[in-house]
Amino acid sequence: MGPFLLKLLPAGHIFGSAMLHVISKTNGASLLYTGDFKLRESYTAETNALIPADTLIMETTFGKPNWIFPGLTEIEEQIKCFALEAFSVGHVPIFLCYSLGKSQELQAILGKAGIPSVSHRLVYEMTMACRRAGCKVASGVKFDGLVPDNHALILPPNSAKKMLPLIPNCKTAILSGWGLDARAIHRFGTNVSIPLSDHADFNELKEAVNQVRPKRIITVHGFTREFASELRRLKYEAWSLQGHDQLELDL
């Protein structure tokens, strides 16, 4: 495009998400803009494909060392146990997660565990759109007001206030990276929190920098100043887009 070569790369965030790699035709300088991304394995998102760049502009949603997520196997077990425990006492397990991305990942996890589910209309429509675009995830069943026995229900978080009073005998779980903090159940008003995230955690953010090998890094979104400070400690040139970086002194 004009004086630049543009390339889209899989971000690993959700199905179809992409990063942008830019090379100047004039001097060969390169830039990688990640947008939201993750490096962890996924059933529905394409595998992240980082490549080297001179400048890295990266999201740092979870850019502090206390944000390190469990592996996918452990997350799957938490989801399975929550659903089966709810079934065992005659309750409906309800998972609250975004309609696009996380809901499709959850459907894949539930399907692998042999747990059938019904989905809110918005979740169902997003899933069908992903399937039309090539995502290999089951279509699921659209919620019609009733949840069959031994079925889980998938709802967007912003529909919970309206929908939950209609579902007697239910248990709720929020699926969010912020669920790593035990206080998340109070923030989201759920029975449990499960830290299924479609963002890179602290270790993945550092690994992304290692793979890209940039000369300079700009952090955007989340703990931008904190992660930029961590990178400067590791001898990178790194700055928060928000500014007001606190410079470190070697004493």
Where are these regions (language model features)?
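His/Asp/Glu-rich metal-coordinating catalytic cores
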Residues: M1-I94, G101
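Generic "edge-of-domain/loop-turn" microfeature
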Residues: H13, N27-A29, K102, Y124, ...
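Active-site metal-binding loops of divalent metal-dependent hydrolases
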Residues: I14, G35-F37, T60-F62, L100, ...
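Short helix/loop capping segments that flank catalytic or ligand/cofactor-binding pockets
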Residues: S17, E41-Y43, P65-W67, Q104, ...
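Binuclear metal-ion centers of metallo-dependent hydrolases, dominated by the metallo-beta-lactamase
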Residues: L50, K64-G145, R216-L251
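C-terminal regulatory/interaction regions
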Residues: K112, G140-L251
